[in-house]
UniProtKB/Swiss-Prot annotation:
One Pfam family hit: RRM_1
Designated gene of the protein: hrpa-1
Family matches, as PANTHER family: HETEROGENEOUS NUCLEAR RIBONUCLEOPROTEIN A1, HOMOLOGOUS TO DROSOPHILA SQD (SQUID) PROTEIN
GO BP annotations listed: hemidesmosome assembly; mRNA splicing, via spliceosome
Protein name: Heterogeneous nuclear ribonucleoprotein A1
Low complexity bias: start-end ranges: 332-346
GO cellular component entries: catalytic step 2 spliceosome; chromosome, telomeric region
Lineage of producing organism: Eukaryota, Metazoa, Ecdysozoa, Nematoda, Chromadorea
Length: 346
């Protein structure tokens, strides 16, 4: 894919043709009394506003604590994000770039993080190249390419850490990036604590009633399953955040079905947690012979983030096997080295 094709796909070009998601911000942390007029009064200082709404409880008509502001161009959004913190109705609120509905099939979209996950990393990519490229979105504090422990070659993904979560949001909205002549796709690189927060957000949004256009959920609605941290799963191959498994396993949501709440076939993992032949992974999803999810039953064992392994390794969050596992379940006692601050080659 060429730079021109990347720009066309990402909606770059004339401000009048900019996609709405590049011109919209989500504003959380509003008081129950915040009105559209109060939001407009504050955000009009950054430029022309084309639409504004405070999401309200259908019964009480009071603010549900968040809303959206759409500007006439992306430059107004940039100006607003540079002038944080924002104080509306006497309270510091939480503005961030809005995620379009067609991308909103992952609850983590509304969780802020300073770390960016980068897929499509090739052997001719270096950490310095990642730093040089992504510096245009903000100050990069760290870049790392994840290597295979045996071959010392890139496993196809890496991470870039910024000093501000808004830099990550800008990169995610851009979708695809050309780094050293190769297309790289990005998403938020959430920690397990941030993933837990994302799930709580998802649960809260599900209970929050309908949005203005009738879609269930709060922050632009909810959605289905995610992709894989480290690319598609291979039968018998290594997992993303975990050791090798027997049958098939996935990365963050897996490749043999889907992520949160989506049904899958065969075997699959959650956070890179490999599975043996049967059993579901992900958050509450079903597949094969058992259910995964947060503590869901799996072959008469408790499942974790992606469920337990059939062998000696236990599950992740809440998962138990014969031994305690790591993130999503790992073989034996080996845990994800990066999470422990150890060797980066995993």
């Amino acid at each position: 894919m060429t730079d021109v094709e990347i720009k066309a796909e990402n909606g770059s070009g004339d401000a009048s043709l900019e996609p709405e998601n590049l011109r919209k911000i989500f504003v959380g942390g509003l008081t129950s009394n915040t009105t559209d007029d109060l939001m407009r009064e504050f955000y009009s200082q950054f430029g022309e506003i084309t639409d504004i709404i405070v999401m309200r409880d259908p019964t009480t008509k009071r603010s549900r604590g968040f809303g959206f502001v759409t500007f006439s161009g992306k430059t107004e959004v940039d100006a607003a994000m540079k002038q944080r913190p924002h104080i509306i109705d006497g309270k510091t609120v939480d503005p961030k770039r809005a995620v379009p509905r067609d991308d909103k099939n992952r609850s983590e979209s509304n969780v802020s993080t300073k770390r960016l996950y980068v897929s499509g990393v090739r052997e001719d990519h270096t950490e310095d190249m990642l730093t040089e490229y992504f510096t245009k979105y903000g100050t990069v504090t760290k870049s790392e390419i994840i290597l295979d422990k045996a071959t010392q070659k890139p496993r196809g993904f890496g991470f870039v850490t910024f000093d501000d979560h808004d830099s990550v949001d800008q990169c995610v909205l851009q979708k695809s990036h050309m780094v050293n002549g190769h297309r790289c796709d990005v998403r938020k690189g959430l920690s397990k604590d941030e993933m837990s927060k994302a799930q709580m957000n998802r649960d809260r949004e599900t209970r929050g009633g309908r949005s203005r256009d009738g879609q269930r959920g709060g922050y632009n609605g909810g959605g289905g399953g995610g992709g894989g941290w480290g690319g598609p799963a291979q039968r018998g191959g290594p997992g993303a955040y975990g050791g090798p498994g027997g049958g098939g396993q996935g990365g963050y949501g897996g490749d043999y079905g889907g992520g949160w709440g989506q049904q899958g076939g065969g075997g699959q993992g959650g956070w890179g947690g490999p599975q043996q032949q049967q059993g579901g992974g992900g958050w509450g999803q079903q597949g094969g012979g058992g259910q995964g999810g947060w503590g869901g039953p799996q072959q008469q064992q408790q499942g974790g983030w992606g469920g337990p392994q059939q062998g000696g390794g236990g599950g992740g969050w809440g998962g138990q096997g014969q031994q305690q596992g790591g993130w999503g379940g790992q073989s034996g006692a080996q845990q994800w080295a990066h999470a422990q601050g150890g060797n980066r080659n995993y």
